[in-house]
Amino acid sequence: MPVYDLFFKYITLMQIGNTPAQIKSRSPLAVIGEWTEMIKLEHTVFALPFALSGLILASPQLPGLSTVFFTILAFIGARSAAMTLNRVIDAGIDRANPRTKDRAIPAGRIKPGLALFFAVASFALMLYAASNLPILCLQLSPIAVFWLSFYSFTKRFTWLCHIVLGIALGGAALGGWVAAAGCLSGAAPWLLALAVSTWVAGFDVIYACQDYAFDTSERVFSIPARFGIARALLISRALHLATVASLLGLGLSLHLGIFYWLGFTSVAVMLTYEHSLVKADDLSKVNAAFFNVNGFVSIACFITILLDKIIKF
């Protein structure tokens, strides 16, 4: 039997159960799909563009391919580890929540032990990538590991969990900046990180409104559970106003050009549109607000920052 087949059967046994019949029912693509769904690979569109934006803004010219490669590799490792840990730590909560009970770990399709191994391997990948970037990246890695691990516990004791998540993703922008500059001097990297942090926290509050009934009944901490949906949406708006203010400060501090300001205007319009989709008494468009609009926000920022670097008027 080929080595690949043996390896695949071993991984499949560790994941889902114990019988050859179960193995035959799972193709390699199905297993890969299960894992990519668990770590929500499609949500990479939220933070990776901002990590690359930090990389571009901190570079005097366009960054080299090696720097771009190891920055992306570090991001993939960090994000995969964080999402996997979140799924393992929250498995009990997810199992009790009708919206999340069919996720891979609570449904028994992926075993927690294998998921933890994957998380450790992902952190190792992040550390390897960081070792190929400026030394400050490696020196800051323990803070990243701690914060990414810490987030998953916060919904058990504080409604500020959304802010903690925002800071985690804001760290991606700082990581990109350090990968290019080797330091965090001046206001600009912190304004970029603040923009990302408040943006993520704001849309996470909107997303959490879906679980208001469950969170209040099960004593899961969140801004909607603490303040109610209507006030939570107001808090989300305030956070997104801070996002716009931070991006304004970033553009002014770096004297960015016309493309950046086109992106800035687009982001302000899209965030306004996002909040028009969601009402306290109508959450039917939360998914559209969460994924579609916010995906465009991060991509618009990245593309316009890249164009601003390449084309000068």
Q: Which role does the model predict for each range below?
A:
Residues M1-L13:
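N-terminal amphipathic/basic-hydrophobic helices that include classical n-h-c signal peptides
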Residues Q15-G33, M83, R87-I110, V205-A230, ...:
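Cytosolic, membrane-interface loops and tails of multi-pass inner-membrane proteins
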Residues L29, G249-F313:
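Extended hydrophobic alpha-helices typical of membrane-associated regions
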Residues I32-M38, L73, R103-L191, T272-K279, ...:
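Intramembrane alpha-helical segments
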Residues G33-E42, F46, R109, K155, ...:
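Membrane interfacial helix-start motif at the N-side
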Residues P49-G54, L165-V178, R226, F291-T304:
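Small-residue-rich segments of transmembrane alpha-helices in multi-pass membrane proteins
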Residues F50-S53, L57-A91, R99, F123-L127, ...:
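Membrane-embedded alpha-helical segments that form the functional core of polytopic membrane enzymes
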Residues V68-L73, A91-S141, S217-I258, L262, ...:
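Multi-pass membrane catalytic core of lipid/isoprenoid biosynthesis enzymes
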